[in-house]
């Protein structure tokens, strides 16, 4: 199995413009444009993605949608990629998708960086 870890694109800062919760913050115009380019570039890298798992927060979901669209896939939302979630929960969520060999995980910092550390430490 191959995991591709993606931190969401550039998001609107703070609570403004009618946004009342951090979970509602969308990507900025720059963030959307950047993620469109990233998704196109990923397609050129000979990645054979089977699955796109994403945090349910708006900015991560939007990022995942660009990637999924580029690969002709749907986005599966999982609370296991929400901020500050135990990585054991994420591993269980990934394991539920038995046939998937190449998976994009779209989440947040510092969680994605900590996940990389845990994967390296575990020798996965």
Please place each PLM-identified region on the residue numbering.
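Active-site-adjacent alpha-helix immediately C-terminal to a catalytic or transition-state-stabilizing loop
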Residues: 91-124
């Amino acid at each position: 199995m191959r995991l591709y870890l993606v931190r969401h694109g550039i998001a609107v800062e703070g609570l403004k413009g009618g946004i009342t919760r951090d979970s509602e913050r969308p990507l900025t115009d720059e963030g959307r444009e950047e993620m469109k380019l990233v998704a196109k570039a990923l397609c050129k890298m000979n990645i054979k993605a089977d699955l796109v798992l994403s945090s349910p927060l708006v900015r991560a979901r939007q990022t995942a949608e660009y990637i999924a669209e580029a690969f002709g896939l749907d986005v599966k939302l999982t609370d296991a990629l929400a901020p500050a979630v135990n990585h054991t929960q994420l591993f269980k969520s990934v394991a539920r998708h038995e046939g998937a060999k190449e998976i994009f995980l779209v989440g947040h910092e510092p969680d994605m960086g900590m996940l990389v550390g845990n994967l390296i430490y575990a020798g996965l």
